[in-house]
Design a protein with these regions (language model features):
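Membrane-interfacial loop- and helix-cap regions that link adjacent transmembrane helices
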Residues: 18, 22, 35-41, 51, ...
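Glycine-rich segments within core transmembrane alpha-helices of 12-TM secondary carriers
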Residues: 57-65, 134-186, 287-294
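Helix-to-loop junctions at the C-terminal end of transmembrane segments
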Residues: 63-85, 163-164, 290, 294-305
Length: 305
């Protein structure tokens, strides 16, 4: 149940603001993760035939992990969200353009790393920004952001299928323009936290009220302080999630590329023969099916009842 379900009598202004939050965070999650999926799905076209896809998979995720570990724990003080959003937008665009227009393996891996770092920075930035809203609005935004990251898999894999005939240069060059949708969504569609706090309508206030919320205080935590906060969550929450994601990505990126079958005959498998024309078509198809179910699993708090 989301915030709209809990307060069906919300005034039009409050409903409109929440819908803008939903649309904005869905787009932010979608575009932030979409390039990662596009690169992964296009792995066989991006890399030379003699290079294993595991190299691309590593470069596509390692910089994102570094950015997620670096920024929350080592940087203190006020977050400049505007600068971060532009850094994510331009980083994603430049990374994709580097992959598209430089045929050399090294420069393509550099481009993949830049796009990956931008994606990791974007994820923590948008989740941190969601906490600037009242509590119930924060959970509402995070639910739609998660749904957007799930849709990124489905739409990203589908997008590569559509632009694949254009080749790496044309296809990735065209998709790189979508990166600017991140800035558009953040600066134009997403309401400012100050707009939410100025609302005085009693129904809208009920929508955002959190009776347990303490007055805001400016805190500057050191790295050791943040580690102390992390320790109680490590065993019961973080380690199980690490195991789940490790198994998931091992299967998806390590095992799936090795599962190949003969090209289907049009007489025996009419539907599959329309989709699969060569052995290289299997992996993108695996990604499309996989990402479809990722979207379903990440939408149970927002879109799905």
């Amino acid at each position: 149940m989301n915030a709209l379900d809990e307060h069906p009598s919300a005034v039009p202004q409050g409903v409109t603001l929440l819908r803008r939050h939903a649309v904005a965070f869905f787009i932010l999650g979608l575009l932030n993760n979409m390039m990662y999926v596009v690169i992964l799905t296009a792995a066989l076209e991006i890399l030379p035939s003699h290079v294993p896809t595991g190299i691309l998979a590593f470069v596509n995720i390692a910089p994102a992990v570094v950015s997620k570990a670096l920024f929350p724990y080592y940087f203190k003080g006020e977050i400049w969200y505007g600068w971060r959003v532009w850094a994510c937008t331009l980083g994603s665009f430049c990374g994709m353009m580097c992959i598209a227009f430089f045929p050399g393996l090294f420069l393509r891996l550099v481009g993949i790393g830049i796009a990956s770092f931008a994606s990791g920075l974007g994820e923590i930035t948008f989740l941190q920004y969601a906490t600037r809203y009242p509590h119930q609005v924060t959970t509402y935004c995070i639910g739609w952001f998660a749904s957007g990251t799930g849709a990124a898999g489905l739409i990203g894999a589908s997008a590569w299928w559509i632009v694949r005939p254009l080749g790496v240069r044309g296809g990735l060059g065209l998709l790189s323009l979508l990166s600017f949708g991140t800035a558009l969504s953040f600066f134009v569609i997403l309401p400012l936290p100050s707009i939410m706090s100025r609302s005085t309508d009693e129904t809208t206030e009920a929508l955002m009220q959190d009776s347990d919320r303490e007055p805001e205080r400016n805190l500057s935590l050191s790295f050791s302080d943040k580690v102390q906060l992390l320790k109680p969550m490590l065993i019961p929450y973080i380690m199980p999630l690490i195991c789940v994601y490790f198994a998931e990505y091992t299967i998806n990126q390590g095992v799936a590329p090795t599962l190949l079958f003969t090209v289907p005959d049009s007489k025996q498998h009419k539907l599959l023969s329309m989709i699969i024309h060569s052995l290289r078509d299997y992996y993108p198809l695996y990604q499309l099916v996989y990402q479809a179910f990722v979207f379903i699993s990440r939408s149970y708090t927002s879109i799905l009842p």
